[in-house]
Amino acid sequence: MNVKIIVEFIKKFAEENNCKKIAEIGIGFKFDVARELSKYFDLIAIDINEKAIEKAKLLGLNAYKDDLFNPNISLYKNIDLIYSIRPPRDLQPYILDLSKKVNANLIIRPLLNEMPIKELKLKNYKGEVFYIKEKQI
């Protein structure tokens, strides 16, 4: 997984789609992508793990605890782009549903060799694989 290329792809996609506010879903303890993207965008980091949120805040990220199975929709007000790095396959439909509820673009950087869930388009970028869904206009 090449963090530099992942950041480059998300940044390029966000700029091309005029995304101002973005959210990383399921940040866990991997903060590299969010920290870099927060230099360019209003970014929030989301996870269900309280310790991950505390660590993200210590690193200067705007981080919030939330549950994908029962999301607090108000956290995602004005979010233009949701992205997630290597989320478990069984969580991906919930991430897609959330992006639809808030009408946000979606980028998922999957684990390798996963089949995309319906409605997501496969995109290869400099050796990295992404699934994307553009928001409805």
Swiss-Prot record:
Highest taxon, organism lineage: Archaea
UniProt cross-references to InterPro entries, sorted A to Z: SAM-dependent_MTases_sf, UPF0146
Family from the record: Belongs to the UPF0146 family.
Name the record gives this protein: UPF0146 protein MJ0688
Protein species of origin: Methanocaldococcus jannaschii (strain ATCC 43067 / DSM 2661 / JAL-1 / JCM 10045 / NBRC 100440) (Methanococcus jannaschii)
